[in-house]
Amino acid sequence: TRYVMMFYYPQDTTLDMGPTCVVPQSQYLPRREVEQTRAEFDRLSRAGLNKIRDQLLAKTMTPQESEKAVKAVYKETAEKHPELAKKNKTLEKLWKDKRVPLVGPAGTLVFVHFDIVHARYSSNELGLPRHMVKFLFTRNNDPVKPSWNHADPDWKQEETSVSSEIMKPVWLDLWNWHLGNKQSNENTITSVKSLCDRLKDSNDELAVSAAYELAKSDEGVELLIEIFNSDDTNLRSIAAYGLRAAGQRSLDYLAPLIDKEDPQKVARVIDVLGDIGPPADSLLEPVIKAASSQSVVVRRYAVEAVGLIAQQQVKCSRALIEQLENALKDEDAIVRRNGAFSIAQLGDKVCSELVVDGLIENLQDWHHHVRGWSIEALQRLENERALKAAIKYLNHTRWDAYPKSGDRTVTDQVMRLEDPVR
């Protein structure tokens, strides 16, 4: 768990005010069938939605009118494709039935995993203001030992549901990760063939748990690599979970893939290496090199991954620092954001005059995530000029009054300020 969110309610929030809700234990499931069905439904609705977007940009339609128009577009799509609409509704209901509404008095704080499924629970029937502030917390470093009053190294499974039993390999791996152990030493007794069948199951829990089981043996990792390299986008992400869990065991298989010509494949490999973190430090050099790729997608993942992989190094190379200096000036907003993120992770180990200059300049960036990570990074450099710039900025702003200008759909194209919002 590298990211945690905190939800804060500044007012009393009841069920009839439309609170936020979460789906417990959903953070490790990709919801493939739901997302695929929803994506197809959105694709069929795209023409109507684009028309509404264009009218909003031209200011010939109000936001209130657009809400009604969007509902009308989806209704029309459902009438034209009733079977798809029925399937979509059925799949969504399976998740909606597991939702837990977050209600409470003013001052309520809720801490949740960054990837947990969360959304509005219901409409605001009272019409009263219902504000909620989100805070994002990030680890400075992956754990090397327990951070709590820890006595028993064994994982204790409190729940006895079928779902919890299926997901036990996942919980056990995460438990070991939080203890600072590199990977689980528990050997699987399930055959690789049986696990392969489970990996290909449409049930997310069965598939993900199988990937974690396969990660425990060399034969299993070979199978995960084969699937990871396949054209089956439905299974590649599941295989990636297993390769992350395999840690150092997967590095010899991933190393030859970093130099492939396909930028999408290279990006996927680097993404896994970043998820593995410090245990992947033997491949840090090619990841640093990839940070100057012509592909914006590869640059994004590489610039982020260097901060995760190098976090436990005593000293960072000049080549790494130069790539981060360049990242802060990249034409792509996501690369600049990830550059600031990695600098915040690595702190004074990557401090240079150009790093400080770049971060100070990016305090005025159009993308709110670039601004946010830049101010965070300046405070972690242990540099007098950086700290003075951070204090000056915080004194002037106190609160970021700029709009969330970076909330745009991320594509494989360079993101610029002047591009139309999509």
Task: List the model feature ranges, each with a label.
Residues 202-204, 231-232, 261-262, 294-295, ...:
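Short inter-helical turns and helix N-cap capping residues of alpha-solenoid HEAT/ARM repeat scaffolds
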Residues 111, 115-197, 207:
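Non-heme Fe(II)/2-oxoglutarate
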Residues 188-199, 217-229, 248-259, 278-292, ...:
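Amphipathic alpha-helical scaffolding segments comprising HEAT/armadillo-like alpha-solenoid repeats
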Residues 1-106, 117-128, 135, 139:
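Non-heme Fe(II) oxygenase catalytic core, chiefly the N-lobe of the double-stranded beta-helix
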Residues 168-187, 205-217, 234-249, 256, ...:
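Structural detector for internal amphipathic alpha-helices that build alpha-solenoid repeat scaffolds
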Residues 18-19, 33, 145-147, 381, ...:
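Short, charged, solvent-exposed linker or helix-capping segments at domain edges/interfaces
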